[in-house]
């Protein structure tokens, strides 16, 4: 039997500051990463050698491309991921305080993953 972990839910881009301890308004440089708890779980599971699959929706945009390419590189099955031209991929900007605690600012209404339907 081939067991598969299927995750369903949000897929977004996390923009993480290159410097810690700054207010979001003062940050000049970010790195982009795939984000969303389901995406993180699928990628981590695949990196451990298990089969994982994602059911979500991303925009037909550069950020959606980045998510799909990153998941593919992690060996995550993306055959159930939908693409839409109607809504963009969700974005999250993450502020990190001096201790590394996170504070999120989301840009997700409207966004692709919130409009996933059967």
Where in this protein do the model-derived segments appear?
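Glycine-rich phosphate/adenosyl-contacting loop at the front of the ribokinase-like
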Residues: 1-76
